[in-house]
């Protein structure tokens, strides 16, 4: 499998393209679909939801999660890498990303 350079990946993001970021085989051994929110639209979200088949995540600072009262997904995080997630949210008034269905409400 061929991988592009970090520089090419950054350029693709700057151009509004989505990329796949893969981690090490000894970690989670998975790929994440990544896009810049300013370039995202309904098609991007639908592609991530249907083809990615996982959570659609938006990185936020801990202070933002606290201000929005977003609880931790797990009270006792035992992940060896300390990966942290808040509880899932799916509401157009509180979510950074939304589908056209939510936008219509």
Which role does the model predict for each range below?
Residues 1-5, 23-28, 52-58:
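A generic short-segment signal for beta-strand/edge and adjacent turn/coil regions
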Residues 27, 104-105:
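A very general structural signal that marks isolated residues within well-ordered alpha-helical segments
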Residues 98-103:
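Conserved small/polar residues in nucleotide/adenosyl-binding loops
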